[in-house]
Amino acid sequence: MSVSILEQAGVSAATETIPEMALRAVLMPFYNNLGDRNSSFDLPEGVSQFFVAGAFLVTPDQDWHMLTASLGFPSEQNRLMIPIDGGHPGRVRATGEALYLPDTNAEAGKFKQYLKTARMGSAIYAPMIWQGKFIGQIVMAARARNSLYPKDFALMRAAAPLAAAVYVAKGGLEWLVKMYPPVDAYKVSPEGL
């Protein structure tokens, strides 16, 4: 399954002409297939499992991580903007290393909720590095704890260089300069919501 997901991501992204749509095409197979979707989860009454995915790009002024290619995020957070050193996106940028959080509750006091709809229980962050420079990160999160697995983490790490290459090849660096700052920016503080 892993090779087919990567292949699907690459083939889909190659047909896109807009950088953000190319990133979304890379992420869509992961968003649709990774993680546990059917187990009995330890979720509050009336809450069901759901996933989000996207790419947080470093803005041209280096002040923010800006959400693009969002999947599953609320529409008003289409351009969620997290301060550059905020939360786990800031940690991934600082270290340049991918981050796997099977249970965000295990990160006592460290996990910051930026998603408006819910606190996510599992999360993956994989850096997009282009020619030695950190340009952003792809992310995926699940509402339920322990529902993203090491195999999902490995696939997201493998997808991150593909995402970076596709984004740059489609003119993403220039696209970001032209569209920044976004009119629909949803800025949050480092502390989260």
Regions found by a protein language model. Name each.
Residues 7-67, 170, 192-193:
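Helix-loop-beta substructure at the N-terminus of cytosolic sensory domains
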Residues 46-48, 114-120:
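Short loop/turn motifs at secondary-structure junctions and domain boundaries
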Residues 50-52, 87, 123:
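Short coil/loop residues immediately preceding or within conserved phosphate-binding loops
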Residues 58-113, 174:
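Regulatory sensory and allosteric helical modules in signal-transduction proteins
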Residues 78, 141-158, 166-175:
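Regulatory loop-to-helix N-cap segments in sensory/regulatory domains
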Residues 122-129:
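A short, aliphatic-rich beta-strand micro-motif
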Residues 169-193:
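Signal-transducing coiled-coil/dimerization helices and immediately adjacent hinge/linker segments
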